[in-house]
Amino acid sequence: MKVTSSKLIEQKKPVLKQLLDRLLQTYSYASILMTDSKGKQYTISKQGISITENMFVELGYVVKVYDGESYGEYAFSHIDENEIDTIAEEVKNHVMPWAKKLPDDMKVKQYPEIPDEAYHFEKSTDYEVLPEELGDEEIVKRLGAVREKAMAQDEKIVEIKTACVYQIYHKLFLSPNKDMTQNVMWTNGMIMGLIPKGEEMKMAFDSCSGCGGMEILDDMETKIPPLVQKLNDLATSEPITPGEYDCICAPDVTGMIVHEAFGHGVEMDMFVKKRALAEKYIGEYVASPLVTMHDGAAAASETATFFFDDEGTLAQDTVIIDKGILKTGICDAQAAMALGTKPTGNGRREKNSHKAYTRMTNTFFEPGTDKVEDMIASISYGFYLENASSGMEDPKNWGI
């Protein structure tokens, strides 16, 4: 099934089109982004049951205008027909005169007008089980059953925590040549356990995610056996001797490396600021010929899947590294204009009141052809790394 449209967007769209026409009387380019979203997070642990609103939920609008030299933005949370002139005047009188407030010795960087190809569509992602139809009570019951089943696997396990979070968001983007709507739902599931090892407490977790609905609860149950195995392995583990070893990375560790150690380094707004080493290595080998790296909302069906970004650029599948050679970075529209290149559909806002930055979407290495068992057999002594819990980017040095 497809995620349905937002009734609020349908209601507000005629008014927003009037606002766009009003802005275009003054500016050669204007765009409007409307976001309407909802979502919840469910957590079950020894401490109890928690149901909270998803932290990414928002409702709001942002207009962007071009005065022939630079861009300005104005965010607001409500609009009806009698507020159109007020918003237009606010943009004219308080947003676009921003350059006059700069110190005399500070120059304004001139930007061209954003290319505005014609696109008119409404697209939706697929799902099997709608969270609202399943209901809070049943979701909690299912999460509780996963927790109880995991706890029953081994009496040494002292805690199992299960969690599930979803978001359904709708976005409308309007410009002189664009009228695009997207309806997207993503879901994440997590199961975490604790087991004692002497006076220590060891932790392991597993997770699943996707562009879809509460069918993810079925996936969570399949994570119980590997989680219990990890916990038992940790309970009998010994500290390693510090040194250099051959290692094989589980997909979650590989994902952390591709995201932190390299992904942030090819966000091209950092090229504009000369804060990224990657700019100097375009066209050169930066990895093994076995490595091909992608980023893009259209590159996979996952939690960062969408049809257009927050600047109205269509979703893409960007090949960043092709058989070891660094081909390109990822870019928002503003940084692309500064660099004289094309945006890649990576302009993302934390919320409507924040500017769009270059940010990753679905970032990953292409799978190889070797079997894990053969890879392990090829190493005389080493370690299999899994359960990455955190990382830190280093665009200027490519450190890990």
Tell where the protein language model's regions lie, with residue ranges.
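Dual-mode signal for accessory low-complexity, basic/Gly-rich regions
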Residues: 281-400
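Active-site bordering "gate/hinge" segments
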Residues: 1-308, 313-316, 322-325, 361, ...
